[in-house]
C-alpha cells in the first residue's frame, strides 16, 4: 500500500513538519528533499491574516507575521524499521512578507530515491516501488511471489526451510512446483559414449555435497559391480548400475547351475541363491544311463546333464565291462540270452583243460592273447581223440562284482572239431589273428549305468536318453560331488566355495548400502533433534544423538539470536557409526 508525504503543525516543536508514510515493507526509503513548505505556510498565514482582520477590520495592510523558522523533520514509519537519509544543510524553510507586503516562500521539491517513483495528483504526492528493483542488499518479507496469470508461485519460509507453492492449486489441491535449470553435480553416465564400468565420487567437494540434487543427479547415482570377467582370473570393474537399471542374475548353464532371487523384509533385502544341478548315473541292462527313463514314473526331473561327483564316476566305471555267455554250439549247454558282465578289474582265468594247455600272453601294445594247445604228451586213441575236448564253464571271480547270468550255467564240453564261439558283447572287442584271439575292453565303452563303490548308497551314474542321472545305487538318492576344483573357463563346473563367495559378495554389498543408509538416517535424526536458542541476545551449544535400526548418529550445534531478536544463526556438525560426517549452516532474519 503506497503512502504520501503530509505536512502538519507540530505543537510540541512549534513548527511545521513533513511526515513520510511510505510502505513499511520497504527496507530502504527514498528521501524527500524539502526546500520550502509553501502550501502549509501559506495556509497558516492566511488563517493568521483572517484572525487579524476580525480584530482590525479597517486595516488594509497586514503587518508581516514573524514566525520561528520551520524545520523539516523526516520520520521513519510506525514500525521504526525505515532508514532516514541525512538531511542536507539549509533544509530549513520560512514564510514571510516581503517589503511590498506579499507572502513569499521557497519552493518544495519532492524527489523519488532509488527504486521509487512519485506521482502527483493535485496536492497529493504518491510514492510507489518501481517494477524493476536494483542494488538491493536485502529484502524482508513474509512471502515472495513470482509471475501471474495462473502461474504465480509463492515462496515462504518457516523453521523447516523454504516452501514453494502455486498460488492457484491444481488437481486434488496440488500446489507443488517444479524447479527447473538445476545443474548436475555427479559424473554424467547418461552420455552415449560407451559403457561406464566404474564411477567414484572422489571429485565431489564438501560444498558440492550441500547442493540441491537434480533429476539428472538421481539418474546418475548408482553402484559399481566388480568381479572376474570371462577369460580372466583377476577381479576387475565390470559395470556401473544407475538408478532404474535392471540387474539380472542368470545361470550361464541352466543344465548344471540354478539361480534363485528372493526379495525379503518388504523389499529391503534381496537374496541371490546359486546352486548346482546334479545328475545320477544308473545301470540298466548292463549299460550306464543317466537322467529319467522315458517310462519311469515318479517326480524325478533329472535330465542327465547335471553334475556328478568323482566317486559316482568311479562307481560307474567299476560297473563297466564286457558281457559274455556260453552258446549251445557243439552240443554244449548254452546260456541263451543271459550274459555275464565282466566288469572293470574283474579277473578272467583261462585254465588248461583235459588234453589242452592254455597260454595267456601280452604284447608290447598291451593286447592279451589266449592260446589253447593240445597236450601231445598224452597218448590218445581214436576214441579218446573223438571224445577229447575241453569243458567251458562260467563263474564269478571271488571277491569281485562279476556275476554269471542265469541260463546255461553248467559246464559244457567242447569236443574235437567242434567250434567254440567267443562272442564280443557290449564294450568288448575281439581280434582274431590266426590262432590268436585278442579280447579287450572297448576304448569307447557305452554303459547304461556305472556304480562307483559298493553298497546300496554307492553313487551310480546312469543315462536316460540324453540325460545323465547321478544318485545312490539303491534308491537313487541325491549324492554330493566333492573335491571339485574352482571353475576357470566358461562351461567349467562351479564349486560351492565359488558360489558362496559370489553370494557373500552380493550380501556384503547390499548390507553395506543398507548400513550406510541407516547410519545416514540416524545422523539426520540426531541433527533434527538439536535444540536452539529462542531468546534475543542468547546463544546455545547443543549436542544430540540418534539411532535407527542398529546404527547411531550424533550431532553438535551452535545457535545464536541477535540482541534485537531479528537475526538468527545456526550451524551443525554431525557424524554416524559408519564413519561418515556432515555439516550444515544457516542464517535467518525474523520480524
Swiss-Prot record:
Signal peptide boundaries: 1-51
Q: Where is this region: Surface exposed passenger domain?
A: 52-503
**This protein's UniProt keywords:** Cell adhesion, Cell outer membrane, Membrane, Protein transport, Signal, Transmembrane, Transmembrane beta strand, Transport, Virulence
Q: What is its main location?
A: other
The UniProt entry's GO CC annotations, sorted and at most eight, read: cell outer membrane; cell surface
Write out the coiled-coil annotation as residue ranges.
Answer: none
The effect of disrupting this gene, in the record's words, is: Deletion of the gene decreases the ability to adhere to Chang epithelial cells.
Q: According to the UniProt record, which cysteines are disulfide-bonded? A: none
Q: Does the keyword Transport apply?
A: yes
**Family matches, as InterPro entries:** Coiled_stalk_dom, ESPR, NhhA_Tpr-ring_dom, Pilin-like, TAA-Trp-ring, Trimeric_adhesin, YadA_C
Query: One Pfam family for this entry, by name?
Result: TAA-Trp-ring
Q: Which residues cross the membrane?
A: 537-547, 551-561, 570-576, 580-591
Q: Which family does it belong to?
A: Belongs to the autotransporter-2 (AT-2) (TC 1.B.40) family.
What does the entry's domain section say? The signal peptide, cleaved at the inner membrane, guides the autotransporter protein to the periplasmic space. Then, insertion of the C-terminal translocator domain in the outer membrane forms a hydrophilic pore for the translocation of the passenger domain to the bacterial cell surface.
State the oligomer form and interacting partners.
Homotrimer.
This molecule's function is given as: Involved in adhesion of capsulated meningococci to host epithelial cells. Interacts with laminin and heparan sulfate, promoting the adherence to the extracellular matrix (ECM) components.
Can you name this protein? Answer: Autotransporter adhesin NhhA
Amino acid at each position: 500500500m503506497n503512502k504520501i508525504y503530509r505536512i502538519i503543525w507540530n505543537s510540541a516543536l512549534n513548527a511545521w513538519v513533513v511526515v513520510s508514510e511510505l510502505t513499511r515493507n520497504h527496507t530502504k526509503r527514498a528521501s524527500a528533499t524539502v526546500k520550502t513548505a509553501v502550501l502549509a505556510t501559506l495556509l497558516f498565514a492566511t488563517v493568521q491574516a483572517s484572525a487579524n482582520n476580525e480584530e482590525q477590520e479597517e486595516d488594509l495592510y497586514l503587518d508581516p507575521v514573524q514566525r520561528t523558522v520551520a524545520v523539516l523533520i523526516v520520520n521513519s514509519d510506525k514500525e521504526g524499521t525505515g532508514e532516514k537519509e541525512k538531511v542536507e544543510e539549509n533544509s530549513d524553510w520560512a514564510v514571510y512578507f516581503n517589503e511590498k507586503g506579499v507572502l513569499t516562500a521557497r519552493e518544495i521539491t519532492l524527489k523519488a530515491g532509488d527504486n521509487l517513483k512519485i506521482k502527483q495528483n493535485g496536492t497529493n504526492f504518491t510514492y510507489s516501488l518501481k517494477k524493476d528493483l536494483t542494488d538491493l542488499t536485502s529484502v524482508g518479507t513474509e512471502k515472495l511471489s513470482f509471475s501471474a496469470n495462473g502461474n504465480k508461485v509463492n515462496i515462504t519460509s518457516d523453521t523447516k526451510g523454504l516452501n514453494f507453492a502455486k498460488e492457484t492449486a491444481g488437481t486434488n489441491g496440488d500446489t507443488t512446483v517444479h524447479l527447473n535449470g538445476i545443474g548436475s553435480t555427479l559424473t554424467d553416465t547418461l552420455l552415449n559414449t560407451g559403457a561406464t564400468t566404474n564411477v567414484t565420487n572422489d571429485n565431489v567437494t564438501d560444498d558440492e555435497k550441500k547442493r540441491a540434487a537434480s533429476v539428472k543427479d538421481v539418474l546418475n547415482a548408482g553402484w559399481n559391480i566388480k568381479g572376474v570377467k570371462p577369460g580372466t582370473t583377476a577381479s576387475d570393474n565390470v559395470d556401473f548400475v544407475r538408478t532404474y537399471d535392471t540387474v539380472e542374475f542368470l545361470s550361464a548353464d541352466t543344465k548344471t547351475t540354478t539361480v534363485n532371487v528372493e526379495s525379503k523384509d518388504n523389499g529391503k533385502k534381496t537374496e541371490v541363491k546359486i546352486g548346482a544341478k546334479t545328475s545320477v548315473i544308473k545301470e540298466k541292462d548292463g549299460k550306464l544311463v543317466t537322467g529319467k527313463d522315458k517310462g519311469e514314473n515318479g517326480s524325478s526331473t533329472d535330465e542327465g546333464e547335471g553334475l556328478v561327483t568323482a566317486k559316482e564316476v568311479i562307481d560307474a566305471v567299476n560297473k563297466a565291462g564286457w558281457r559274455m555267455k556260453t552258446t549251445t554250439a557243439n552240443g554244449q549247454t548254452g546260456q541263451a540270452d543271459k550274459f555275464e558282465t565282466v566288469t572293470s578289474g574283474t579277473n578272467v582265468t583261462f585254465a588248461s583243460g583235459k588234453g589242452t594247455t592254455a597260454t595267456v600272453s601280452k604284447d608290447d601294445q598291451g593286447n592279451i592273447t589266449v592260446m589253447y594247445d593240445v597236450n601231445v604228451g598224452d597218448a590218445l586213441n581214436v576214441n579218446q581223440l573223438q571224445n577229447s575236448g575241453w569243458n567251458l564253464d562260467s563263474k564269478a571271480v571271488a571277491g569281485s562284482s562279476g556275476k554269471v547270468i542265469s541260463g546255461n550255467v553248467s559246464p559244457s564240453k567242447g569236443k574235437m572239431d567242434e567250434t567254440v564261439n567267443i562272442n564280443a558283447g557290449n564294450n568288448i572287442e575281439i581280434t582274431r589273428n590266426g590262432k590268436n584271439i585278442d579280447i579287450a575292453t572297448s576304448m569307447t565303452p557305452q554303459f547304461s549305468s556305472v556304480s562307483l563303490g559298493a553298497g546300496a548308497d554307492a553313487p551310480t551314474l546312469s543315462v536316460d536318453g540324453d540325460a545323465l542321472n547321478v544318485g545312490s545305487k539303491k534308491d537313487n538318492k541325491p549324492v554330493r560331488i566333492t573335491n571339485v576344483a574352482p571353475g576357470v573357463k566358461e562351461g567349467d563346473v562351479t564349486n560351492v566355495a565359488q558360489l558362496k563367495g559370489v553370494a557373500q559378495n552380493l550380501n556384503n554389498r547390499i548390507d553395506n548400502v543398507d548400513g550406510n543408509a541407516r547410519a545416514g538416517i540416524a545422523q539426520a535424526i540426531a541433527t533434527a533433534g538439536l535444540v536452539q536458542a529462542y531468546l534475543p541476545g542468547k546463544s546455545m551449544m547443543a549436542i544430540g544423538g540418534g539411532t535407527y535400526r542398529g546404527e547411531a548418529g550424533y550431532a553438535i550445534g551452535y545457535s545464536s539470536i541477535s540482541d534485537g531478536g531479528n537475526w538468527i544463526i545456526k550451524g551443525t556438525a554431525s557424524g554416524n557409526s559408519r564413519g561418515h560426517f556432515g555439516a550444515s549452516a544457516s542464517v535467518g532474519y525474523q520480524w
